[in-house]
């Protein structure tokens, strides 16, 4: 991109790729998906009050290696991270996806009637619903039960 300066001098600079944030739903397949997940996680943590946030971290392939940067946060007993750990085992991943599905199902049926979405509800109501964010790496390694709940959750994100 070229910009004309005040004195007529041309300046050239690059802009990074920009993703809308927070996205309603974001799914990406890329060889650097771990880096992308880390960047989005850091962006979320720096832009959202932690008392209004719950993050579910799933690394089904590398035993939590994708989220190594979060390990220091996990040591601090931060309750905004689901179970205060990076989920790597099939059963705990399935339970987390089931938990997220139940949360979405209950809130969509009970609290969000008459509202456009969670953001619209939180703008109007005094008891805002926390933002739930799922960071998932290794979809191919998920069990069939976990995939079932992932598909159920995905239906809410569309």
Predicted regions and their residues:
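P-loop NTPase catalytic phosphate-binding loop
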Residues: 1-158
